[in-house]
Amino acid sequence: MSFRGGRGGGGGGGFRGGRGGGGGGGFRGGRGGDRGGGGFRGGRGGGGRGGFGGGGRGGYDQGPPEEVVLVGVFSHKCQDDIVCNNTSGKIPYFNAPIYFENKEQVGKIDEIFGSPGENGFSVTLSQGVKASSFKSGSELYIDPGKLLPVERFLPQVGGGRGRGGRGRGGDRGRGGDRGRGGFGGRGGGGGGFRGGSRGGFGGGDRGGFRGGRGGDFGGRGRGGDFKRSYDGGGYGGNSNKRTKFD
């Protein structure tokens, strides 16, 4: 009856199951747990298809929601699945349960395709439900809590630090023109097109085209300093002897 199960523990009766625990009876199952088994919400990577937190198979099915709303109409079948046109004006969750109007479950959303403004989805049917039983225009329903506003998938207009603006990843923000590793990635250096220190095309210290150490054709680098060794000041020159010509 510990407050929190240990890492790799069973989590039985604990307030929160351990990492890798079974989560049996715990308030929240462990990482890799059963996602269920009496727990309120399973851990990372667990089961619980249709449970409170969604996820994999074998968890507690809470049954149909209190309310369902129209999400789309049947368009055509594709092998054992059905394809529907979204008429809700919102975007459904992946793996969200789909129902008839009487809250009988039809299946679960498998794929969503199209643009934010005009899209559709495919449904993997529940056992015993046949794709051949649907007619064109048959209505399908969903829990309203499984819908997202379409604005989340539209580009942000004006101000803020949205993508492509002056913010992170933008033209002049963090991740500007001279970025690390990328064509215009974040920071300096790291092999970028105009990278700085590490292997950049016009970079600085380490092995760059005009770099310093190791490969400076006429500069100050160690090893391979062509100019200094030729003039007698380098490592391989004989600086103590002078040849006298009459």
From Swiss-Prot:
One of its GO terms (cellular component) is box H/ACA snoRNP complex. It holds the Pfam family Gar1. GO terms for biological process: snoRNA guided rRNA pseudouridine synthesis. Keywords: Nucleus, Repeat, Ribonucleoprotein, Ribosome biogenesis, RNA-binding, rRNA processing. GO terms for molecular function: box H/ACA snoRNA binding. Residues 168-180 have a biased composition (Basic and acidic residues). Residues 1-61, 155-246 are annotated as: Disordered. Residues 4-59 are annotated as: RGG-box 1. It is found in: Nucleus, Nucleolus. Residues 181-221 have a biased composition (Gly residues). Signal peptide: none annotated. The keyword Ubl conjugation does not apply. Residues 161-223 are annotated as: RGG-box 2. The keyword tRNA processing does not apply. Required for ribosome biogenesis. Part of a complex which catalyzes pseudouridylation of rRNA. This involves the isomerization of uridine such that the ribose is subsequently attached to C5, instead of the normal N1. Pseudouridine ('psi') residues may serve to stabilize the conformation of rRNAs. Component of the small nucleolar ribonucleoprotein particle containing H/ACA-type snoRNAs (H/ACA snoRNPs). Belongs to the GAR1 family. This is Probable H/ACA ribonucleoprotein complex subunit 1-like protein. It comes from Caenorhabditis briggsae.
